[in-house]
């Protein structure tokens, strides 16, 4: 067999393996727009097995089981190795937040708000930081257990430190190649899953900030396809979570996708010139700041911004038609799911009127179109994203059970097996939102709706801040009494392993490695005679 024949044979073998992999039940709801041949041709000759693939399989089994049983895996945003080891005792997944990374772990060391304006290595680096800690503490614990006689081994902790990590990919930090490189980084660093949102990259905001700009549905689907393609090239089961910010979005970059047309607003006042032209003229005349804002506010007020179907309904109601409601119902039924051009034709055919509606006139100074988000809008997007992702998350303004149910019911009406995720955000005022007994059951009530993975994005940040403030305040007044009462004594009472921080950090483990390579004796062992941690025995 010639070299080229062998090369082709190996290629066909790998293609067959990929096709068999894709036939696994793991992918029964996944749509791919590329072939196995295309994926294999993008791989190198050296096959690399990524540890994160084991974590991805583990994560899939968790959410698959939870969804099937109307149960839930819930977690929160982790800050550091200390936190990840403590979370592992009680929670079966770990979340890595872009918000937290932006404020505490940017790879430039420059903190800031959640605008995704940090280098895109930032969140993958945090994932790597935590994953390396997970691997280390797993090794440390295993060594302790295997060097403990069976009769005493039950007394040694047996924590599953290898909890799957789901991380924040923001908007992907650029175009499709940037998204693929970001996905590759996450896989290399140990992520089991990532989520990506449908905001525009240059204007990305925290999900609970104003001024969010969406990309068209088709553009976000391309992002999801890029993530899956990169994971396939690397041979991993990485979970892709599609987040939509459309519930509260007010702008969109383009009208290119007909699926977005229903939710784009236009000017219905034909007497007005386009806003962008008006603003440009005002700037040229020397106006700035509050003067420009006043001009825009006045224009918006006069423009009578509406969705196209609202403009048609108002036109019918203002006309002389005999059966107005029947005409309205006809239009709404016939125009459902149609592009704006098609809806215009239908409206003119039914009413005999060319309804004035100009979405270009309403564009902002930056060129964005006006958009009217909401739960139904988010459902529309989620239905489009579903075949290309593993879970879907709708960012929301409030912890509103009725809205969560509306979203879940809307998605499941089309995709009944679609797994959902939910942000139990600290941006919500939970005390004002619901009484304590409802807070206690909220996670499980959402689980009944199919929200099988839930998370508090910034609980790590807030618990760290609360503890730092509480202890610092007491320490400034009470000295070491504060440390004893607030930290050390509760650590001992609750059997927190970090009480003996030398052991927690792996000092015994490293001592045993030193002894292993030095013939069984080390005069410089860290945990030898004189170590102060003996005081806690």
Swiss-Prot record:
Pathway in which this enzyme or protein is active: Carbohydrate metabolism; glyoxylate cycle; (S)-malate from isocitrate: step 1/2
List of residues binding Mg(2+): 168
Disruption of the gene: reported phenotype: Leads to limited hyphal growth in plants and extremely low germination rate of pycnidiospores.
SUPFAM superfamilies: Phosphoenolpyruvate/pyruvate domain (SSF51621)
GO molecular function: isocitrate lyase activity; metal ion binding; methylisocitrate lyase activity
Induction or repression: Expression is induced by starvation and acetate.
Enzyme superclass (EC): lyase
UniProt cofactor(s): Mg(2+)
Keyword tags: Glyoxylate bypass, Glyoxysome, Lyase, Magnesium, Metal-binding, Peroxisome, Tricarboxylic acid cycle
GO cellular component, one term: glyoxysome
Binding site for substrate: 97-99, 207-208, 243, 423-427, 457
Lineage: superkingdom: Eukaryota
One GO biological process term: glyoxylate cycle
Catalytic activities: D-threo-isocitrate = glyoxylate + succinate; (2S,3R)-3-hydroxybutane-1,2,3-tricarboxylate = pyruvate + succinate
Function (record text): Catalyzes the formation of succinate and glyoxylate from isocitrate, a key step of the glyoxylate cycle, which operates as an anaplerotic route for replenishing the tricarboxylic acid cycle. Required for growth on ethanol or acetate, but dispensable when fermentable carbon sources are available. Also acts on 2-methylisocitrate. Plays an important role in plant pathogenicity.
Assembly notes: Homotetramer.
Entry's family note: Belongs to the isocitrate lyase/PEP mutase superfamily. Isocitrate lyase family.
Name the UniProt record assigns to this protein: Isocitrate lyase
Gene: ICL1
């Amino acid at each position: 067999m010639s070299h080229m024949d062998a090369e082709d044979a190996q290629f066909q073998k790998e293609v067959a393996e990929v096709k068999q992999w894709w036939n696994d039940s793991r992918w029964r709801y996944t749509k791919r727009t590329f072939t196995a041949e295309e994926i294999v041709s993008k791989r190198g000759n050296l096959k690399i097995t990524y540890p994160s693939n084991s974590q991805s399989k583990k994560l899939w089994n968790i959410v698959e089981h939870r969804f099937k049983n109307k149960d839930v895996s819930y977690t929160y945003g982790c800050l550091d190795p200390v936190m990840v080891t403590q979370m592992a005792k009680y929670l079966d997944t770990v979340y890595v937040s872009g918000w937290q990374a932006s404020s505490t772990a940017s790879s430039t060391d420059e903190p800031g708000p959640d605008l995704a304006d940090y280098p895109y290595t930032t969140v993958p680096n945090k994932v790597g930081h935590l994953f390396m800690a997970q691997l280390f503490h797993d090794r440390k614990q295993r060594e302790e257990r295997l060097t403990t006689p069976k009769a005493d081994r039950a007394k040694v902790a047996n924590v599953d430190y290898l909890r799957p990590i789901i991380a924040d990919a923001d908007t992907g930090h650029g175009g499709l190649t940037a998204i693929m490189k970001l996905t590759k980084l996450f896989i290399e660093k140990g992520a089991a899953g990532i989520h990506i949102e449908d905001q525009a990259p240059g204007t990305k905001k925290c999900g609970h900030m104003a001024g969010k700009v969406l990309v068209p549905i088709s553009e976000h689907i391309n992002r999801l396809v890029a993530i899956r393609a990169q994971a396939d090239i690397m041979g991993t089961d990485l979970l892709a979570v599609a987040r939509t910010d459309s519930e509260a979005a007010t702008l969109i970059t383009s009208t290119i996708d007909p699926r977005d047309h229903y939710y784009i607003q236009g000017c219905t006042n034909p007497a007005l010139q386009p806003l962008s032209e008006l603003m440009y003229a005002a700037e040229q005349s020397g106006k700035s700041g509050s003067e420009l804002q006043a001009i825009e506010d006045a224009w918006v007020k006069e423009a009578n911004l509406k969705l196209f179907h609202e403009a048609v309904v108002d036109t019918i109601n203002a006309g002389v038609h005999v059966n107005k409601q029947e005409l309205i119902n006809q239009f709404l039924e016939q125009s459902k799911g149609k592009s704006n051009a098609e809806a215009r034709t239908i409206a003119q055919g039914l009413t005999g009127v060319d309804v004035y509606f100009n979405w270009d006139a309403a564009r902002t100074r930056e060129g964005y179109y006006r958009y009217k988000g909401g739960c139904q809008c988010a459902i529309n997007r989620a239905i489009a994203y579903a075949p290309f992702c593993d879970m879907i998350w709708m960012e929301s303004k409030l912890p509103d059970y009725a809205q969560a149910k509306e979203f879940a019911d809307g998605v499941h009406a089309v995709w009944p097996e679609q797994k959902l995720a939910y942000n139990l955000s600290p941006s919500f005022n939970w005390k004002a939102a619901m009484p304590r007994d409802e807070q206690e059951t909220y996670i499980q009530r959402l689980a009944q709706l199919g929200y099988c993975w839930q998370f508090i994005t910034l609980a790590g940040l807030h618990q760290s801040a609360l503890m730092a403030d509480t202890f610092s305040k007491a320490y400034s007044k009470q000295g070491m009494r504060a440390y004893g009462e607030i930290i050390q004594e509760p650590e001992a009472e609750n059997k927190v392993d970090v009480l003996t921080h030398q052991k927690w950090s792996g000092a015994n483990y490293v001592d045993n490695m030193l002894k292993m390579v030095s013939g069984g004796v080390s005069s410089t062992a860290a945990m030898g005679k004189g170590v102060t941690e003996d005081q806690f025995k």
